[in-house]
A protein has these predicted regions:
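Generic detector of well-ordered alpha-helical packing
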Residues: 11, 86-87, 140
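C-terminal domain-boundary segment and adjacent tail
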Residues: 46-77, 166, 192-213, 224
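Active-site beta->alpha N-cap acidic-glycine motif
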Residues: 27, 39, 45-48, 53, ...
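Membrane-proximal basic amphipathic "stem/tether" segments
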Residues: 1-35, 40-41, 45, 217-241
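Metal-dependent polysaccharide deacetylase catalytic core of the NodB/CE4 family, i.e.
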Residues: 31-38, 79-80, 99-187, 212-220
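Short, function-defining helix-loop hinge/capping sites that tune catalysis or transport
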Residues: 93-94, 147, 226
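Aromatic/hydrophobic pocket-lining residues that form the small-molecule binding cavity
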Residues: 54, 91, 154, 158
Length: 241
């Protein structure tokens, strides 16, 4: 059944790409990763990827694309940026690989999980922030959905996470990603009030100078993705869903 679903997905993706996306493939494609070997509860989707597979993917990307920051739209060609959500402890393993290839990355950290078992420590986060190609951003306090919160709860999540991380890295933080890709009409106004300049969501697509700063598109990479799947996601085969 799973194989059949993949075949159907790929057929639809091929048709979508060739009719809608082939001539729109300019800009930055940001990829989302989460965990790198950690066994996560209820991970039926496969967001925890084998670290060796991640290494192979980074080598492939570095060999075939220009790698840039998530908010760098200066190239006239397709560029790739890497983002990592949540802040699991095994993020350190992924960052060692990114650093070896000199690949820029953005790390979005759930501030309420810092120092907990299985998550990055304050020392980890500070050390990561000192890497030349790193950007540190917030990912809420609790990893709950913003669209399920009232205004004051959202404000507190975005403010507290910002202050906690700024205190750790001793630098201004102006970027966030929405937990579960969830936000509502209040969220962007709160971001502006708190001094955020960028926010990443879960909408798929290319980013450019015309992209809303608070709706940066990202495409999720999961454990079952092959290099072909990775390439197709970059091209936009699956942007239709």
């Amino acid at each position: 059944m799973r194989k059949t679903k993949h075949i159907i997905r790929d057929i639809i993706g091929y048709c979508y790409y060739n009719t809608m996306k082939r001539f729109q493939n300019i800009g930055n494609r940001c990829l989302i990763y989460h965990a790198f070997g950690t066994r996560l509860k209820h991970d039926s989707y496969g967001i925890s990827i084998n670290i060796n597979k991640f290494k192979d993917q980074m080598k492939f990307l570095n060999d075939h694309y220009k790698m840039t920051d998530i908010n760098d739209f200066s190239s006239d060609d397709v560029t790739i940026s890497i983002s990592i959500d949540d802040g699991y402890k095994d993020t350190n393993d992924a960052i060692n690989i990114l650093n070896n290839y000199n690949i820029p990355f953005t790390l979005f950290i759930t501030a309420g999980k810092i120092n907990q078992k299985g998550y990055l420590s304050e020392t980890d986060i500070y050390n990561i922030s000192q890497i030349k190609n790193s950007i540190i951003g917030t990912h809420g306090m609790s990893h709950n959905r913003f669209e399920k919160m009232n205004y004051s709860s959202q404000f507190k999540e975005l403010k507290d996470s910002k202050l906690i991380l700024q205190n750790i890295i001793k630098e201004e933080i102006n970027i966030t990603s929405y937990p579960h890709g969830s936000f509502d009409k209040n969220t962007t106004g709160i971001l502006s009030k708190l001094g955020y300049k960028w926010a990443a969501c879960s909408k798929k697509g290319f980013n450019s100078f015309s992209t809303d700063n608070f709706l940066l598109c990202r495409s999720e990479i999961i454990a079952s993705d092959t290099i072909i799947d990775l390439t197709n996601k970059i091209k936009g085969y699956y942007d239709y869903y």
